[in-house]
A protein has these predicted regions:
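Flexible, glycine/charged-enriched surface loops at secondary-structure junctions
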Residues: 111-117, 161, 201-208
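Long, highly charged, low-complexity intrinsically disordered interaction regions
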Residues: 169-216
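Generic secondary-structure boundary/loop-capping signal
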Residues: 80-83, 161, 193
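Intrinsically disordered or highly flexible coil/loop and linker segments, enriched in small
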Residues: 11, 108, 156, 198-205
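Conserved Radical SAM active-site core
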Residues: 1-129, 134-137, 150, 168-178
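A conserved active-site cap/scaffold subdomain adjacent to cofactor or substrate pockets
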Residues: 129, 140-184, 190
């Protein structure tokens, strides 16, 4: 399907993601296999953004990174506390580990490219992440500080924000009946993120302890 769309110029690239099937290594190997076939068997030259699976062997992530343009590890929620509340099977440490590995591999690859000829590129478009907003009580101020820290510590190219959309009732989640997706809030965070990435604004210059929300 991807190659049919690509040949007809319907698409210029592919975003490939997956939930964990059987195990992180099994899932990461499946993602690698898809990318390998696209690049080497079908000569796909388009843009590929692939997800790295937390808990997968670093060798699998490395092999996949040489076939992708961008790689992402979703941080899921703004804080470790929220992650423990809503996704206790996941840990912040487990999520940040592949993010750090991709950063280190990218830095090493940049050095190799400058030193040697014909070195394959590792995720040349960098890495990104995504966090869900509105499912937990963090303020815009807290969320921007998390994003700012991720940009600094992991050399991220983008942080994506996804407005929480309730689909079922859960005592730990906002009510399906009362909660609307915070789309305006998502939009404001993207605007603030743009100011931080392109104009060098700090989170503390956009919001403060006394004013923690863009909608107040």
């Amino acid at each position: 399907l991807t190659m049919e769309f690509y040949r007809r110029n319907y698409i210029e690239g592919l975003f490939l993601s997956s939930g964990v099937l059987k195990s992180p290594n099994y899932t990461m190997e499946l993602l690698y296999t898809v990318l390998y076939k696209l690049r080497h068997e079908h000569n796909f030259q388009g843009y590929i953004h692939v997800k790295a699976i937390p808990g997968a062997d670093s060798r699998l992530i490395q092999m996949t990174g040489y076939l992708a343009d961008r790689m992402s590890v979703n941080i899921e929620l703004p804080t470790a506390e929220s992650l423990r509340l809503l996704a206790p099977h996941k840990t912040r440490k487990n999520i940040l580990a592949p993010m750090r590995f991709v950063q280190q591999m990218s830095a090493e690859n940049q050095y190799e490219i400058q030193t040697y000829r014909h070195v394959p590129k590792f995720v040349p478009a960098g890495q990104s992440t995504q966090m869900i907003i509105g499912a937990t009580p963090e303020s815009d101020y807290q969320i921007l500080h998390v994003a700012e820290s991720l940009y600094k510590k992991f050399d991220l190219k983008r942080v994506f924000y996804s407005a929480f959309i309730p689909v079922n009732e859960d005592k730990n989640l906002p009510s399906v009946k009362e909660q609307r997706p915070p789309l305006l809030r998502e939009h404001r965070l993207y605007q603030a993120d743009f100011l931080m990435r392109f104009y060098g604004f700090k989170a503390g210059e956009l919001l403060s302890e006394d004013n923690q929300s863009f909608n107040d």
